[in-house]
């Protein structure tokens, strides 16, 4: 079987050459483990942060098989709770097959399409939902700004905020992305950070200030937004993609100044902080989807061999919506054909 290892840790920008595709023997599960066939791999900016040091998981170092969340099919189980043929989400790897401790897999409902298990009903949608409502405490009267608005999480943050009546302004890279989030996803406006004076344009779009900022990029974008925050505004710190590949990361120069004078609340989180509330979120988002208030946006790359390219593209802002890689055919679609 094929798998990718991190061949060499990147100094700054990640390149396809940092990975190596290997041919290895099919692994065998032991008691308490399952062997899965990976179908879809989740491609996330967090994949890059795992290479920089220990976070909420061990650091990925040279020689490690590249980890990833996945949707997978159980091929062999050494745990009575799981059976061959079941579809699961898993803390898996960039590989055709993976052996995983059963505590790191979850059974999936059979009425949700597999890509949706990684997008709206997976890491992306759940991160958007819990960040917006549980951390940011969004309410209908809020003016909400979200950076990386065309990215995996941002596309859902904006739509969820619009669904409860918020004014939503996105920040994205390029005129095409900005037009898409406004015309296809219903944002009230979007600022192209590549061709903008952010402070000026945020004032134009949000003349009365910003109640809630969902930050996916950090750096100078966060710096500009803090200037336009209302007193007692909330900043949801979800990611810092602008800093992940910088040899000298740029931090906002107005912290703690504006945080103090504006009495701002900045809070970071990871999606698993709210694991016990996932079903509540999925139920709510299913209702919004059925009501036509959310559009699912997915960016699927075909083939395990293209996983490094998909991650590099994401880090360079080339994806629109939730990025993932299809490793194997969908068994549901095969049964229907």
Regions found by a protein language model. Give the residues of each.
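N-terminal Rossmann-like NAD(P) cofactor-binding module of classical short-chain dehydrogenase/reductase
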Residues: 89, 145, 191, 213-214
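C-terminal capping/lid region of NAD(P)-dependent oxidoreductase domains
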Residues: 1-4, 293-300, 308-337
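Glycine-rich phosphate-binding loop and adjacent beta-alpha segment
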Residues: 182, 220-294, 327-337
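Short amphipathic alpha-helix with an adjacent loop that forms part of the alpha/beta core around
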Residues: 197-208
């Amino acid at each position: 079987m094929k798998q990718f290892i991190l061949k060499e840790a990147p100094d700054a920008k990640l390149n396809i050459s940092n990975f190596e595709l290997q041919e290895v023997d099919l692994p065998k599960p032991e008691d308490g483990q399952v062997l899965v066939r990976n179908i879809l791999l989740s491609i996330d900016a967090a994949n890059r942060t795992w290479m920089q040091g220990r976070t909420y998981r061990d650091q990925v170092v040279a020689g490690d098989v590249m980890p990833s969340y996945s949707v997978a099919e159980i091929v062999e189980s050494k745990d009575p709770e799981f059976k061959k043929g079941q579809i699961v989400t898993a803390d898996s790897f960039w590989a055709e097959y993976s052996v995983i401790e059963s505590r790191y897999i979850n059974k999936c409902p059979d009425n949700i399409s597999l890509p949706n298990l990684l997008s709206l009903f997976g890491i992306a949608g759940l991160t958007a939902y819990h960040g917006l409502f549980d951390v940011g405490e969004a309410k209908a009267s809020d003016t909400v700004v979200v950076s990386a608005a065309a990215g995996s999480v941002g596309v859902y943050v904006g739509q969820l905020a619009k669904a409860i009546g918020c004014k939503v302004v996105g920040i994205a890279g390029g005129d095409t992305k900005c037009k898409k989030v406004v015309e296809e996803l219903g944002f009230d406006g979007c600022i192209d950070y590549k061709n903008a004076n952010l402070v000026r344009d945020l004032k134009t779009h949000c003349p009365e200030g910003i109640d809630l900022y969902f930050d996916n990029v950090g750096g100078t974008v966060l710096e500009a937004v803090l200037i336009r925050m209302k007193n007692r505004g909330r900043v949801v710190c979800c990611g810092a993609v602008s800093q992940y590949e910088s040899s000298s990361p740029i931090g906002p120069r107005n912290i703690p100044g504006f945080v103090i004078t504006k009495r701002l609340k900045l809070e970071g989180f990871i999606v698993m902080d709210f694991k016990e509330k996932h079903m509540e979120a999925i139920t709510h988002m299913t209702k919004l989807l059925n009501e036509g208030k959310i559009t699912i946006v997915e960016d699927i790359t075909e083939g395990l061999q293209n996983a490094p390219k998909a991650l590099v593209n994401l880090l360079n802002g080339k994806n629109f919506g939730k990025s993932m890689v299809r490793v194997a055919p969908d068994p549901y679609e095969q049964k229907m054909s």
